[in-house]
């Protein structure tokens, strides 16, 4: 599945390089028009990251996200600094289909597991942002990638399998926003190890060949941000490579 994505800072469409707020590119685009275009081209799921909210929870862009949800028919998943149940609940109440939770799952797994039990495994997607070290270990980063988390991807997945984890988004931080191609080896490995989880691949997608490579890796979906914004290819072309299931 092709999952077009936009990142938002203060209401503007942006891209960060490897998650670094100091390396920001701002696009002169309307978030709604951009998402409407992705919807019109056949996207079945849209992905929004609230980067302002990720950095400062008091400045969450909830009003804008609510407006986007109200003007689109396609299901939307939203991430960016979810730290409390109230924030999760607020997003679900305004019509977001699935909320992406990252750092908190590393820092407070018991709390996040209780949300899986309360809201169900369709409502939450775990975001596992990994740094792969020289030993090949997949270490999950936290806090907008500003600090290392110290837990391995596998240990977190095992922990959340106890609450029927179904959706997980995995980013190789070294590839994000770089257009260097996806880490297909990573996706092949985790899809083979945990076939019961719907894996969303993210980071580094530059060409339709990358889309095909991720599809062949066994991932269930691919999040594409920058490549679409700079018109490397269109959503329609990507879906032609990887038709919606």
Swiss-Prot record:
| Cell compartment(s), UniProt | Cytoplasm
| Cytoplasm keyword on record | yes
Name the source's superkingdom: Bacteria
Which reaction equations make up its catalytic activity? 1-(5-phospho-beta-D-ribosyl)-5-[(5-phospho-beta-D-ribosylamino)methylideneamino]imidazole-4-carboxamide = 5-[(5-phospho-1-deoxy-D-ribulos-1-ylimino)methylamino]-1-(5-phospho-beta-D-ribosyl)imidazole-4-carboxamide
Q: Which GO terms describe its molecular function?
A: 1-(5-phosphoribosyl)-5-[(5-phosphoribosylamino)methylideneamino]imidazole-4-carboxamide isomerase activity
Q: In which pathway does it act?
A: Amino-acid biosynthesis; L-histidine biosynthesis; L-histidine from 5-phospho-alpha-D-ribose 1-diphosphate: step 4/9
> Which GO BP terms, alphabetically?
L-histidine biosynthetic process; L-tryptophan biosynthetic process
One cellular component GO annotation, for this chain's record?
Answer: cytoplasm
Positions annotated as active site in the UniProt record: 7 (proton acceptor), 129 (proton donor)
InterPro entries assigned to the protein according to its UniProt record, in alphabetical order? Aldolase_TIM, His_biosynth, HisA_bact_arch, Isoase_HisA-like, Isoase_HisA-like_bact, RibuloseP-bd_barrel
Annotated EC: 5.3.1.16
Keyword annotations:
Amino-acid biosynthesis, Cytoplasm, Histidine biosynthesis, Isomerase
NCBIfam families annotated for this entry?
Answer: 1-(5-phosphoribosyl)-5-[(5-phosphoribosylamino)methylideneamino]imidazole-4-carboxamide isomerase
What family is reported? Belongs to the HisA/HisF family.
Q: Which PANTHER family does the annotation name?
A: 1-(5-PHOSPHORIBOSYL)-5-[(5-PHOSPHORIBOSYLAMINO)METHYLIDENEAMINO] IMIDAZOLE-4-CARBOXAMIDE ISOMERASE
Supply the name of the protein: 1-(5-phosphoribosyl)-5-[(5-phosphoribosylamino)methylideneamino] imidazole-4-carboxamide isomerase
């Amino acid at each position: 599945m092709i999952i077009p994505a936009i990142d938002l800072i203060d209401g503007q469409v942006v891209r960060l390089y490897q998650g670094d707020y100091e390396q920001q590119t701002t696009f002169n685009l309307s978030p709604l028009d951009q998402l409407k275009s992705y919807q019109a081209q056949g996207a079945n799921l849209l992905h929004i990251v609230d980067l302002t909210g990720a950095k400062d929870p008091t400045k969450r862009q909830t009003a804008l996200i609510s407006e986007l949800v109200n003007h689109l028919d396609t299901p939307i998943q939203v991430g960016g600094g979810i730290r409390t149940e109230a924030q999760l609940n607020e997003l679900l109440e305004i019509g977001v289909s699935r909320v992406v939770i990252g750092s908190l799952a590393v820092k407070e797994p018991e709390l996040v597991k209780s949300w899986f039990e309360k809201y169900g495994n369709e409502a939450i997607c775990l975001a596992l942002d990994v740094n792969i070290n020289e030993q090949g270990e997949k270490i999950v980063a936290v806090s907008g990638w500003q600090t290392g988390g110290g837990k391995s991807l596998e240990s977190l997945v095992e922990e959340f399998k106890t609450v029927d984890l179904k959706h997980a988004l995995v980013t190789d931080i070294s590839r994000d926003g770089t257009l260097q191609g996806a880490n297909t080896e990573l996706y092949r490995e985790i899809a083979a190890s945990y076939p019961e989880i719907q894996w969303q691949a993210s980071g580094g997608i530059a060409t339709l060949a990358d889309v095909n490579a991720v599809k062949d890796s066994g991932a269930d979906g691919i999040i594409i941000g920058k490549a679409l914004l700079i018109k490397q290819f269109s959503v329609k072309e990507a879906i032609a490579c990887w038709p919606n299931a």
